[in-house]
Amino acid sequence: MTTADQPQAVRDDAVFDLIAQEAERQRTGLELIASENFTSAAVREAQGSVLTNKYAEGYPGKRWYGGCEVVDQVEQLAIDRVKQLFNAEWANVQPHSGSSANLAVYNALIQPGDTVLGMDLSHGGHLTHGNKANFSGMRYQMVAYQLDRETERIDMEEVRRLAHEHKPKMIIAGASAYSRVIDFAAFREIADEVGALLFADIAHIAGLIAAGEHPNALPHAHVVASTTHKTLRGPRGGIILANDPEIAKQLDRTVFPGYQGGPLEHVIAAKAVAFGEALRPEFKDYARQIIKNAQALAGEFQQKGYRVVSGGTDNHLFLLDLRPQGLNGTKATRLLDANHITISKSTLPYDTEKILHGGGIRIGTPAVTTRGMTEAHMTQVADLIDRALKGEDVQAKVHDFAGGFPLP
């Protein structure tokens, strides 16, 4: 028997044991990080397939390597499915991540030093929307819009004022910690007023858009980028969508040969599987349940006296302000981690805590919804989190509760 024929456990016990530990952690814990989810077995099988052996620089029908007749079909299938999913004229499925997709959008459509208007990171934006530690903040002149202090929602008149004042070449509509519907039509209206391109980053809400549970960005945005995991429930990776053929050409050239060489065809195959799953009627039910669960869970916390940022949620996530409880995001994360409840710490609009700690936590329901939880289970989820935040040891109860919901 060759090494390649041996079972994984025989070939490398150290790695296999760690994978088994992670599988057990996922099985017995409560996963409430808004950007995480559980893929289907079919997605994992595709990603772990022999397609990982194949180099395929270029695009279907235009490769630099021979032997690409099969991976051409795989990639084209992914392209066709994601175009159908988002009603797009063009798609690129090669970006390795959401950040690399965003990088390609910037470099294809604007120049270094150009002004870009995006959401402030501390108000729910993303690192790639202009943070000074990120390429976006280093290479471009970034202007940030913030949420309304009272409503904690996007203030479109403030966006308009900043757009007219700074005349950005690009406006970004999208967020990583914003719980309300994004009005892409209103963003496009402002972009047109100042002659800017509208870039929609839908990484967090892509699955909700695909299911019709959030307005589609593409009829309004010049370009759309997203991850393929999170609410879309696929492998970790990125996509870019557009309708304008000239913009599409620029984006294709920027992804390859501009920033990437060989695409990860095993990941693209897994993307194709996930897109196929998202096209099924039951995915609409899943996306709808994500939102129902998030709203129910937010309501449970409000009944317990916690402050939910903006008063609720329209999507898959919400933010809890823990400052009234004498906690910050870092302290809360430690308390919850000790009980095998995973969330992410978060800054809050107009936060008074240091950015490294944040004044609260971000909670999301995609993963627990994948496991089969419904609104009825959110009472117990909220109770376990509340007790853990108060210093109780609820680890055994978390294990018992989570163990009743199988992983896909």
From Swiss-Prot:
<dbReference type="InterPro" id="IPR001085">
    <property type="entry name" value="Ser_HO-MeTrfase"/>
</dbReference>
<dbReference type="InterPro" id="IPR015424">
    <property type="entry name" value="PyrdxlP-dep_Trfase"/>
</dbReference>
<comment type="subunit">
    <text>Homodimer.</text>
</comment>
<feature type="binding site">
    <location>
        <position position="246"/>
    </location>
    <ligand>
        <name>(6S)-5,6,7,8-tetrahydrofolate</name>
    </ligand>
</feature>
<comment type="similarity">
    <text>Belongs to the SHMT family.</text>
</comment>
<dbReference type="GO" id="GO:0005737">
    <property type="term" value="C:cytoplasm"/>
</dbReference>
<comment type="pathway">
    <text>Amino-acid biosynthesis; glycine biosynthesis; glycine from L-serine: step 1/1.</text>
</comment>
<dbReference type="GO" id="GO:0005829">
    <property type="term" value="C:cytosol"/>
</dbReference>
<dbReference type="Pfam" id="PF00464">
    <property type="entry name" value="SHMT"/>
</dbReference>
<feature type="modified residue" description="N6-(pyridoxal phosphate)lysine">
    <location>
        <position position="230"/>
    </location>
</feature>
<keyword id="KW-0808">Transferase</keyword>
<comment type="pathway">
    <text>One-carbon metabolism; tetrahydrofolate interconversion.</text>
</comment>
<dbReference type="InterPro" id="IPR015421">
    <property type="entry name" value="PyrdxlP-dep_Trfase_major"/>
</dbReference>
<feature type="site" description="Plays an important role in substrate specificity">
    <location>
        <position position="229"/>
    </location>
</feature>
<keyword id="KW-0663">Pyridoxal phosphate</keyword>
<keyword id="KW-0554">One-carbon metabolism</keyword>
<dbReference type="InterPro" id="IPR049943">
    <property type="entry name" value="Ser_HO-MeTrfase-like"/>
</dbReference>
<dbReference type="GO" id="GO:0004372">
    <property type="term" value="F:glycine hydroxymethyltransferase activity"/>
</dbReference>
<comment type="function">
    <text>Catalyzes the reversible interconversion of serine and glycine with tetrahydrofolate (THF) serving as the one-carbon carrier. This reaction serves as the major source of one-carbon groups required for the biosynthesis of purines, thymidylate, methionine, and other important biomolecules. Also exhibits THF-independent aldolase activity toward beta-hydroxyamino acids, producing glycine and aldehydes, via a retro-aldol mechanism.</text>
</comment>
<dbReference type="GO" id="GO:0019264">
    <property type="term" value="P:glycine biosynthetic process from serine"/>
</dbReference>
<dbReference type="GO" id="GO:0030170">
    <property type="term" value="F:pyridoxal phosphate binding"/>
</dbReference>
<dbReference type="InterPro" id="IPR015422">
    <property type="entry name" value="PyrdxlP-dep_Trfase_small"/>
</dbReference>
<dbReference type="GO" id="GO:0046653">
    <property type="term" value="P:tetrahydrofolate metabolic process"/>
</dbReference>
<protein>
    <recommendedName>
        <fullName>Serine hydroxymethyltransferase</fullName>
        <ecNumber>2.1.2.1</ecNumber>
    </recommendedName>
</protein>
<keyword id="KW-0963">Cytoplasm</keyword>
<dbReference type="InterPro" id="IPR019798">
    <property type="entry name" value="Ser_HO-MeTrfase_PLP_BS"/>
</dbReference>
<feature type="binding site">
    <location>
        <position position="121"/>
    </location>
    <ligand>
        <name>(6S)-5,6,7,8-tetrahydrofolate</name>
    </ligand>
</feature>
<dbReference type="GO" id="GO:0035999">
    <property type="term" value="P:tetrahydrofolate interconversion"/>
</dbReference>
<dbReference type="InterPro" id="IPR039429">
    <property type="entry name" value="SHMT-like_dom"/>
</dbReference>
<feature type="binding site">
    <location>
        <begin position="125"/>
        <end position="127"/>
    </location>
    <ligand>
        <name>(6S)-5,6,7,8-tetrahydrofolate</name>
    </ligand>
</feature>
<keyword id="KW-0028">Amino-acid biosynthesis</keyword>
